[in-house]
Structure formats: structure tokens, C-alpha cells
Amino acid sequence: MALRRPMVAGNWKMNGSAALAQELFKKFAVKLQNDSAEVVLCPPTIYLESVRQLLEANKEALNGCLVRMGAQNLSQHDFGAYTGEISGQMLKDSGCRYVIVGHSERRRMYGETSDIVAEKFAAAQKHGLTPILCVGESGPAREARRTFEVIAEELDVVIEKNGTMAFDNAIIAYEPLWAVGTGKSATPEQAQEVHAFIRRRLSEVSPFIGENVRILYGGSVTPSNAADLFAQPDVDGGLIGGASLNSTEFLTLCSIAMSA
């Protein structure tokens, strides 16, 4: 069985501040005791430099603990007249290691199709970033028992453009749309069922990728439900929204992941 290092990725969305970053790093130095889990901070773009400086300044205090930086989005284009966009190379230059692609809010609010998501996935890897690919079904799709169908479609578009082996350098995040920002989380059994399906889907083409790819759960993860979610055999941590804005809650989630 593969040894997949758990990950806790905090997606601040359009929230947070430089002060929150400072508060988190003060607690990281005390609370993070080992490298058994990887912690990723995905602040708004304007705060990437603040987080980068804090990573550098606290390198010794972190004592080998794996704290990384990620972005919430990138353009599928390398450069050009795309006002307000940011390229993969720019994110790489800023110190990012990861970037979220295909988040449900971007798909829903900004019309990002699966084809665009596949292009962004490719752009991330082209510039040395590891994409965190989000997939998930809506409430009506779940009620219609179309969960696997929807997720297979979202995965297959990315696979068709990039190949299965591209997932050797990628993270997948299952985020049921009916749980994102609603306070209603999938049960551990529901999460495990979907994560196992994703792993099987990839294993059909590459058993190595299926066994080794990390799959996070995202959707109203809190300190009260994280232990049961993270204990599932195919759940490798969480993509955290609201709880990532509370330093105490976020550190608790990191500790749970480290002991999962």
C-alpha cells in the first residue's frame, strides 16, 4: 500500500490579511512538530509575498515541518492582454509550489468549463507548479445518483488533454458543491465512496497513479468532523475553506492530519 503524506490546504478565498498570516506562522512554530503532513497556504494573490517572506523568516523555527505556498487560480495563458489575470510563471516566481484549478466557485461564477480547467492544469505543470484539481457534483446531481458520472466527466477531460501520468504531479480535491460553504459536510462514508471511485478510475489506466495520487476532501471540514473524514483509507487530507481563516481551527486540522 502506498504511503501518501496527508495534506491540509487552506483556501482563504477572498478573505484573510497579512496579520492572519503572521498569526498562523507564530502558531506553526509551536504546534507543528513533524513533517508527517504537508500544510499549504493559498491566500489571495496580494498576500503571496507576505507569506513567502514569513516562510523564509520562519524556516529555522519550522524545523523541517512542511509548510508550502499555493495560489487560488491561474490563467491558462502564458502572457498577453488578459487584464487581471496571473500566469503560472508569475506564480512560480512568487514562490508558489501549488495552485488550485477548477474550484467549484470558479466553474460556477466565472464560467470555467472543464476544457478551460484542463488547460489551466496543463499551464500549471508547464511552469513547475503542482495543480490541485477540484472535482465534485451538485446537490441535484447527487439526488439523481449521477455523482460518479459527473466526476468521471470532469476527470476525463483533464486526462484526455494531459494524460494519466500527469497525475504523478498533481493533487485531486473532491468538493461536493452541496457542501462547499454550506456548513453541511459529506459523511465519512460518502467521502470515502467517492474518493475510492476516483482512485479506481485512475487505476484503470495506471495502477501506480491510482495508488499514489493524493485525494483531498473539501466541503465544510471542521475540527469536529476532520478526524473521521481523514481516517478514511482513500482520504488524504482536506482542502479547507472557512476553517482556514481561524488560526486555532486550522492548526487543529493540521494536527489531526499529522496523526491520521
Swiss-Prot record:
Name the top EC class.
isomerase
On whether Cytoplasm is a keyword of this UniProt record, the answer is yes
- Pathway stated in the Swiss-Prot or TrEMBL entry: Carbohydrate biosynthesis; gluconeogenesis; Carbohydrate degradation; glycolysis; D-glyceraldehyde 3-phosphate from glycerone phosphate: step 1/1
- The answer to whether the entry has keyword Ion transport is no
Which PROSITE patterns did the record assign? Answer: TIM_1, TIM_2
What keywords sit in the KW lines?
Cytoplasm, Gluconeogenesis, Glycolysis, Isomerase
Active site (UniProt): 103, 175
Q: What does this protein do?
A: Involved in the gluconeogenesis. Catalyzes stereospecifically the conversion of dihydroxyacetone phosphate (DHAP) to D-glyceraldehyde-3-phosphate (G3P).
What name goes with this protein?
Answer: Triosephosphate isomerase
UniProt organism field: Shewanella amazonensis (strain ATCC BAA-1098 / SB2B)
